[in-house]
Amino acid sequence: MIYFDNSATTKMAPKALETYSQVVTKIWGNPSSLHKLGDRAHGLLEASRKQVADLLGVNTDEIYFTSGGTESNNTAIKGTAWAKREFGKHIITSSVEHASVANTFTELENLGFRVTRLPVDKEGRVNPEDLKAALDKDTTLVSIMGVNNEIGTIQPIKEISEILADYPNIHFHVDNVQALGKGIWDQVFTSRVDMMSFSSHKFHGPRGIGILYKKRGRMLMPLCEGGGQEKGLRSGTENLAAIAAMAKAARLLLTDEKEKADREYAIKEKISKYLAGKPGIHIFSPLKADFAPHILCFALEGIRGETLVHTLEDQDIYISTTSACASKKADEASTLVAMKTPDAIATSAVRLSFDESNTLEEADEFIAAFDEIYQHFSKINHLGE
């Protein structure tokens, strides 16, 4: 089996699974309980929080545990919008965000907020000058993803941070679900970033658990009320086993991070060089420093993306059509549409996404399998004629 769909989800790391099993069987007390079982659970909860904070280079009290990237994004966006609505109801995002951001902005728009969606260029990147022009006295929030989940574009977070340095009251949220452990941290995080979202299952941790980074002093309204866990921002008994396993997975991921990212890039480079220049092939994830090393999106004209996915699946090779979170919906190639890619090409797009366990030998096997498909469809569609 060749699994090139790691941006959709990753296999849980054995050591993270071991941690999960140990915690769920041995440290099963409620962290809010006053007795020693609760104390022990609370101690592990806070140790995990500190471990995550240290790995990200932030303060321990700025880390909040959620159910995943979607909840983190919703909490950051809705929490800011509602908490600051008396100061202004203008919020800004891009036209290429993950559905958990894009749909949240649409919901707020329907509730009376004024939304600006920044356009992107032919590489799916926003222009910081467009953001600068959009800011006004009513702006309370800017939310721009760090790495695009469909084609791997790294957004200009540094340049945006420099602009927002002159607007200290505006909250700046970055969806960094696709960015952790890819050797690009200095491109997607600055001291001006107020909030970030992360999802455990994207970096070999368990599903159903995630992280919200919120800078000290930034006010958010919680999405739900209850027992006041997570400093009142996220009520509900903490999923301690998943939290501890996620912290372990993050530590493993960030060990030898550059070496792992280089291995992923080598696979992307090998396949990209094979694809380059072939008639009917369109590559949307070039070999450039402002693209993530682990994502390769391309299209083969004349064959729908899902057809290619299932054809390769028959050979035990697993890829996806752009975002797995929207791949069964009609708007699956939203980033390519925002880039003004012709529909016939956008619907042919597929995404390969790698992790540190993938190998160059797997890349060779993929190339061999894909080449047979390419030769077959080239004849049918008269590519290159």
From Swiss-Prot:
Cofactor needs: pyridoxal 5'-phosphate
UniProt keyword annotation of Iron-sulfur present: yes
Pfam families according to UniProt: Aminotran_5
Binding of [2Fe-2S] cluster, residues: 325
GO molecular function, one term: metal ion binding
Superkingdom: Bacteria
Alphabetic keyword roster: Iron, Iron-sulfur, Metal-binding, Pyridoxal phosphate
InterPro entries the UniProt entry points to: Aminotrans_V_dom, Aminotrans_V_PyrdxlP_BS, Cysteine_dSase, PyrdxlP-dep_Trfase, PyrdxlP-dep_Trfase_major, PyrdxlP-dep_Trfase_small
Binding site residues for pyridoxal 5'-phosphate: 69-70, 149, 178, 199-201, 237
Keyword Iron: yes
PROSITE patterns from the UniProt entry: AA_TRANSFER_CLASS_5
Family under the similarity heading: Belongs to the class-V pyridoxal-phosphate-dependent aminotransferase family. NifS/IscS subfamily.
The name this protein goes by in its record: NifS/IcsS protein homolog
